Amino acid sequence: AKEKEVTFQ
């Protein structure tokens, strides 16, 4: 996810 500042754990 480099489009938004979202982090997936």
Curated annotation (Swiss-Prot):
Q: Where is the protein localized?
A: Secreted
Which tissues carry this protein? Expressed by the venom gland.
Q: Which GO terms describe its molecular function?
A: toxin activity
* Keyword entries, A-Z: Neurotoxin, Secreted, Toxin
One GO cellular component this record assigns the protein to is: extracellular region
Q: Which family does it belong to?
A: Belongs to the scolopendra toxin 4 family.
Protein name in UniProt: Scolopendra 5887.74 Da toxin
| Protein species of origin | Scolopendra angulata
